């Protein structure tokens, strides 16, 4: 299968990135500095990520608001033009989370038409287009995420308008004569922005941000950062057979909205109660539990790990997993990793 390539692939190769397949795209998993160094750069300074593999669906004009409102779980009436919102697309039959999505609602003047950029996970873009219509715009732009406690300070030297965009705000910002859409969003648990830049201008913007001293980081660090922050990954904590309630994301569902796809099934589960719920686990030692490892309480297998890895900040392993809903914080668990028992304790994410 021919992999999709980021508009920034030449820049990654010039930096000697380790490129791997991810969601049908050839993307950097790490640079020579390594995942741990990249992770810590984001936690303590600033890092930049190419996330151009994320989908982008443009939906605009009359009826756009109503279509999104009738499809996704969250309530767009809670926000306004110039804001971003996290939401879910559910399966109508069982309320499984088909995708978790960020919506960027472009700023507009009174009387101007609404413009939304709906950003699904890479492998789910076609399904989202089928659900809401619109025009796929993934290949018209690159997306550069600049994240970390020093991200905005360092980015301001290169792109001050983008650095000024607030958390969950959306703005159109000009860089060297090119309009970029900038959202105060991310997937690391740190402050920062994501910049959607037209393909032709993307390499120059990437190189300018690198030259400002911000550390390039791969998808390996992005994954360990989101895990430390307790953020779900579609295909692991979300997906077929996993609902918003089970993933401990009931806040993403606007229960008072009169209609959205999967509403009846979601309400039925809320009424009946969930059979399992997502928990965090701190694990003794550095060895990580991996997806699918069995979790036991008092010698009985009661669940399994969905994500696990070493936490560079904490210095030991952490995990997420589904367990019975009555499981309590502080409870001791054991995890079977290829016949070796790891000892852990239940916590409520985030881990850091």
Language-model regions, residue ranges each:
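Internal amphipathic helical hairpin motif
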Residues: 62-99, 149-178
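Short, charge-rich binding segments
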Residues: 78-81, 89-96, 101-112, 121, ...
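Acidic, proline/glycine-enriched N-terminal capping motif
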Residues: 1-89, 96, 220
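Short coil/turn segments at secondary-structure boundaries
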Residues: 55, 59, 93, 116-123
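Conserved, structured C-terminal
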Residues: 1-23, 27-30, 105-352
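Acidic active-site catalytic centers that drive phospho-/nucleotidyl reactions
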Residues: 50, 100, 194
